[in-house]
């Protein structure tokens, strides 16, 4: 069974059962193969812990360092990385077939804002009543959107028609 470097299941100080170990001191210098008693006395003399890093069949690799300080910094690093992760939000904007130029420009600016923030934008174009007879007009609006946002966004999937809707998702380039 392989153990990950510095896992939570590392053996520390007297928990190490091997008679001899490969020792790396606190300055990361390879000391060599020594008895476990000598390795423990070296660790105690500098008030640090002897930690088994890799368990081999012959001689486990042990290092001298402050294990509690390492565990604290490792947990802090993990929590900091979780805080920095950004969840991707999908914003949805709905269009109608007979959208005016000003309304189109307002929604285009909203799309640009969402994309610049790193969000995905779902575009839904809805056909009402007999508008469904002219899906090519809806595709023209979608293609115009793709062209107008081509400098900052790209379509994640091709526009597809589902009933009386045409859907498409835009993502950052």
UniProtKB/Swiss-Prot annotation:
<comment type="function">
    <text>IF-3 binds to the 30S ribosomal subunit and shifts the equilibrium between 70S ribosomes and their 50S and 30S subunits in favor of the free subunits, thus enhancing the availability of 30S subunits on which protein synthesis initiation begins.</text>
</comment>
<dbReference type="Pfam" id="PF00707">
    <property type="entry name" value="IF3_C"/>
</dbReference>
<dbReference type="GO" id="GO:0032790">
    <property type="term" value="P:ribosome disassembly"/>
</dbReference>
<dbReference type="Pfam" id="PF05198">
    <property type="entry name" value="IF3_N"/>
</dbReference>
<dbReference type="InterPro" id="IPR019815">
    <property type="entry name" value="Translation_initiation_fac_3_C"/>
</dbReference>
<dbReference type="InterPro" id="IPR001288">
    <property type="entry name" value="Translation_initiation_fac_3"/>
</dbReference>
<comment type="similarity">
    <text>Belongs to the IF-3 family.</text>
</comment>
<keyword id="KW-0963">Cytoplasm</keyword>
<dbReference type="InterPro" id="IPR036788">
    <property type="entry name" value="T_IF-3_C_sf"/>
</dbReference>
<keyword id="KW-0396">Initiation factor</keyword>
<dbReference type="GO" id="GO:0005829">
    <property type="term" value="C:cytosol"/>
</dbReference>
<comment type="subunit">
    <text>Monomer.</text>
</comment>
<protein>
    <recommendedName>
        <fullName>Translation initiation factor IF-3</fullName>
    </recommendedName>
</protein>
<dbReference type="InterPro" id="IPR036787">
    <property type="entry name" value="T_IF-3_N_sf"/>
</dbReference>
<dbReference type="GO" id="GO:0003743">
    <property type="term" value="F:translation initiation factor activity"/>
</dbReference>
<dbReference type="GO" id="GO:0043022">
    <property type="term" value="F:ribosome binding"/>
</dbReference>
<dbReference type="GO" id="GO:0016020">
    <property type="term" value="C:membrane"/>
</dbReference>
<keyword id="KW-0648">Protein biosynthesis</keyword>
<dbReference type="InterPro" id="IPR019814">
    <property type="entry name" value="Translation_initiation_fac_3_N"/>
</dbReference>
